[in-house]
Amino acid sequence: MSTVPPPLSVLLELTHRCPLACPYCSNPIALAALREEMDTAGWRSLLEQAAEMGVLQAHFSGGEPMLRKDLPELVAHARALGLYSNLITSGVAGGEPMLDQLQAAGLEHVQLSVQDVDPAGADHIAGYRNSLSKKRAFAAAVRARGLPLTLNAVIHRHNAERVPGMIALALEWGAERIEVAHTQYYGWGLRNRAALMPSREQLAATIVAVETARRSLGDQLAIDFVTPDYYARQPKPCMGGWAQRFVNISPRGDVLPCHAAETIDGLQFDNLRDRSLADIWNHGEAFARFRGTAWMPEVCQGCPKREIDWGGCRCQALALAGDAATLDPVCERSPAHAGIRATAEREAASPAPDFVYRRPERPAAVAAEAAISDTE
């Protein structure tokens, strides 16, 4: 029986429930309901299977994973299995009692999202009041417990000018790393693309801000930087290559090669209730479909970067070129490349429409101010 090397990491999307409503959320448009979430036994089994395969890292995400009362149990189980555990959180749910439980369970790292350094801007983007002050308190609680902290800052036209402030905030809050990542336009991000797309000038300014900070700060702060695909000439290796290093588990227990894979019609996604993780990883239809290079069109087959970018993003190829098996339109060899560049420039130059907030109860567009939750 043929096998492939195991994934390096597994992302556990424990829930799609979340206090925030960010318009660029990587969750699918069709959010899983509470009643659809896999139970504790299912997640424990998943961790056991991952460890047996040789997976090294377990990333607990959502939605907001701290809304799951069994999160400390799952973190403890990961620790007992020898898996490195990382929490990806909004920092506005759970509070210090939950953080104490997670530390006791063996949690090893925290990634905290930050929408903006401006309080009003942060609330507008998150669709949640007083978000920045709550995140500040959460970051302080994380550092007080000696846990390593990374800030995740998603960049777009509404906050691009404040990238220097976000880097300064990471230092102020005691983070060891910040990821400055331009919005990736899948799912909710694609739906809100016209509201989020930065201009080329804004992108250039963020590049300067990051490079300047890297030179001045040295080893004080690690800065990861992700540019927006729409202004690129070469595709990035999505998730390190389709079904190469990463596996995503949805709240329902579906096993996915990436966050947005369910947007590709015609692929069969297996569920942990029906097949083992190893069987799905090694032999599942969805994983085999775009793994490696055999699937690539002729122009990709002859490219010297074919085993570097692995053909780019399949979900983006479908969304922008209409075919998941064709060139990623980010690639300058794609016939669709000039069109997506023109789309980005046109949308960035136009007035930003209201956000369509990530809300399961109201998937249609809503006015920005009307959608902000009153959580006080």
From Swiss-Prot:
UniProt record, GO biological process: pyrroloquinoline quinone biosynthetic process
Assigned keywords, A-Z: 4Fe-4S, Iron, Iron-sulfur, Metal-binding, Oxidoreductase, PQQ biosynthesis, S-adenosyl-L-methionine
GO molecular function: 4 iron, 4 sulfur cluster binding; cyclase activity; iron ion binding; oxidoreductase activity; S-adenosyl-L-methionine binding
Co-factor(s): [4Fe-4S] cluster
Pathway in which the depicted protein is active: Cofactor biosynthesis; pyrroloquinoline quinone biosynthesis
Function: Catalyzes the cross-linking of a glutamate residue and a tyrosine residue in the PqqA protein as part of the biosynthesis of pyrroloquinoline quinone (PQQ).
Assembly and binders: Interacts with PqqD. The interaction is necessary for activity of PqqE.
Protein name as it appears in the record: PqqA peptide cyclase
Designated gene of the protein: pqqE
